[in-house]
Regions:
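The feature captures the beta-strand-to-loop junction immediately N-terminal to the Walker
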Residues: 82-84
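Helix-to-loop junction immediately C-terminal to a conserved catalytic motif
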Residues: 97
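ABC ATPase C-loop
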Residues: 202-203
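ABC-type ATPase nucleotide-binding domains, specifically the catalytic core motifs of the NBD
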Residues: 61, 101-102, 120, 145-166, ...
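Conserved catalytic motifs of ABC-family nucleotide-binding domains
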Residues: 206
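Conserved ABC transporter NBD signature motif
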Residues: 105-115, 162-168
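Conserved ABC ATPase signature
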Residues: 185-189
Length: 296
């Protein structure tokens, strides 16, 4: 898949079985990602983004793992970044969180709610409402489900029983299974339940921006569908979601807007439903499926 943004011929038929992609739709997927005239949702036209990233790069010594990244996420919007293993997806999230290893160095501009945050510590970013659910979930296995959730509230320095109980009921509303297992040790949960707990713990801090690193990793298809359905429901809360996924089909089903990351460069972008019908994305990431990717 060529990383050249200007490349691309409009599709004359839809390999997924949907309506043919128009010339204008195909062209929009190669527009400058920093261009506000290339919206993912109507909100882009009237509201400033929660997150706006420009010319973002990450180096490990002399190796540039990520270069020239530009993306934006609106309130209540789900933006996905798909791509193969080793493309730099986790590096992107860790760089945005300020969580790179000591050998990593980030450059470029990160604006969160209009504020430059490149110099802020991880703790300061969390306090401002940015939460990352890492690929390995990083739960406390010997602690109960509820104790793990309580730690999420502490991350934002929340005080008072009223705040805590309100946040807890919100999370239990999204994840009824966690409520059933609230006194159970996290280490005894299934893989899907552990992922639910990791997301729930992040939500306990009432984030404005939630970043998810491969939430479908290692999960059965039915559990992936359940997790993605819950992520889709986050739109109702106004939380902005940046979803990193290798499972392109699942990600494009739930997202409003998407980017394709290859060898450290954002090579393609567009509304998720258009990316799902783009021949290059179909051939490389969706296989030869004959039915359109539904939108949750």
């Amino acid at each position: 898949m060529n990383a050249n943004r200007s490349e691309g011929t409009p599709a004359t038929s839809d390999p997924l079985g949907g309506t043919p992609a128009s010339t204008s739709s195909t062209a929009s997927m190669h527009a400058n990602p920093a261009n506000p005239a290339n919206p993912a949702t109507p909100a882009n036209l009237t509201t400033p983004p929660i997150l706006e990233v420009s010319e973002f790069a990450v180096r490990y010594g002399k190796v540039e793992a990520l270069h020239g990244a530009r993306l934006r996420v609106q309130a209540g919007q789900i933006v996905t970044v798909i791509g193969p293993n080793g493309a730099g997806k986790s590096t992107l999230l860790n760089g945005l969180m300020g969580a790179l290893p000591i050998t990593g160095h980030a450059s470029g501009h990160i604006a969160y709610l209009g504020e430059s945050i490149e110099a802020l510590s991880i703790e300061a970013r969390v306090t401002r409402g940015i939460c990352l659910v890492p690929e390995k979930r990083e739960l406390f296995s010997s602690m109960t489900v509820e104790d793990n959730l309580q730690l999420g509230a502490y991350a934002r320095k929340k005080r008072g029983e009223r705040h805590y109980m309100s946040e807890l009921e919100t999370v239990f509303g999204l994840f009824p299974r966690l409520k059933e297992r609230r006194r159970q040790a996290a280490g005894t949960l299934s893989g899907g339940e552990r992922q639910m707990l990791a997301v729930g713990r992040a939500l306990m801090g009432q984030p404005r921006l939630l970043m998810l690193d491969e939430p479908s990793l290692g999960l059965a298809p039915l559990i992936v569908k359940e997790i993605m359905h819950i992520i889709a429901k986050l739109r109702e809360t106004g939380v902005a979601t940046l979803l990193i996924e290798q499972n392109a089909r699942a990600a494009l089903q739930v997202a409003d807007y998407g980017y394709v990351l290859e060898t450290g460069e954002l090579a393609l972008e567009g509304p998720a439903h258009e990316l799902a019908h783009n021949p290059r994305v179909i051939d490389t990431y969706l296989g030869l499926a004959k039915k359109p990717v539904p939108v949750l």
